[in-house]
Amino acid sequence: MNKKRIRQMDLALRRRLSDRPAADYFAPGDALLRTLETEGYMQRFAGLFSGARLRCADVLSLCRPELEVLCPGEPSEGWLAYAYDYARRLLYPEKTGAEPFAPGAVFLLSVLQVLFAAEAELLPHDPAWTFDFLTDDELAGSPSAPSYQRFLRLWRREFVYELMRLGLEVTPYRTLEHIAGVHHIAVTAARALRKSGVAVDVALVSGAAAGHDLGKFGCRPGERVPYLHYFYTDQWFRRRRMTDIGHVAANHSVWDLEPDYLSVEALLLIYADFRVKQLH
């Protein structure tokens, strides 16, 4: 990994820590931020790029010195599980008491975000792990462009991808592989249809596919996830004023095929979701 990339990653981390939600814990001039500016901090992680996908546990082991400075002790469930739950609560806030470990969780999530962005550039696209979001040229002329751009900003701000990567290591579920696979199939088909002349809003398909199962992170213990995650998915999009994408995202069950008319975007998502479930 060359020095230019390390400098870019250092800059990306500082910018991430100066934006919400990290900015709630790291004020300008913070001692840790000053250290990051002079140390070349991301060089520490260069050895993790060995041609394989990064493991959150390996990143955590290299972040521990900073976490010890930021927080008194360690969460009882461990840093990875705590960071996972913290990110989940960014999507679906809950009433909690004081969170003394929140600065550490935000720092770890921010480091993961920078590292995963570098990983996406260095490794080949994997439909089960990564998302091929739309380019600016593809987005031009889309009626859903404003909502889609907002979706991508919130995807980063709320650490959605990092949440799913952590989930592979701290839960028994493979939610990332399912959501990424659905996105790949739906967007690939939408791009092909658009190229052939069919009127399809690829941005609407991409946003709905990437967000179609976010509601699973809103379900609470004891709730019936297969039924209620549609409601929580719709809730996430509505609260963030992206109802155009949310309407398609929340109605992806095969039972939604019953109405006489569905948009091509909705049909693509339902098909992709069904196909990925068959594959697994």
PLM region spans:
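Short Lys/Arg-rich cationic patches that frequently serve as NLS/NoLS or arginine-rich RNA/DNA-binding motifs
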Residues: 1-5
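Active-site flanking loop/helix segments enriched in acidic
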Residues: 152-179, 213-221
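Inter-helical turn/loop segments and adjacent helix faces that build the functional surface
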Residues: 193-197
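Internal, Lys/Arg-enriched amphipathic helical interaction segments that engage polyanionic partners
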Residues: 87-146
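Conserved N-terminal diphosphate/IPP-binding helix and adjacent helical/loop segment
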Residues: 22, 26, 32, 148-158, ...
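Divalent metal-dependent catalytic cores for phosphoryl transfer on phosphate-bearing substrates
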Residues: 18, 24-35, 42-93, 110, ...
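A positional/architectural concept
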Residues: 181-184
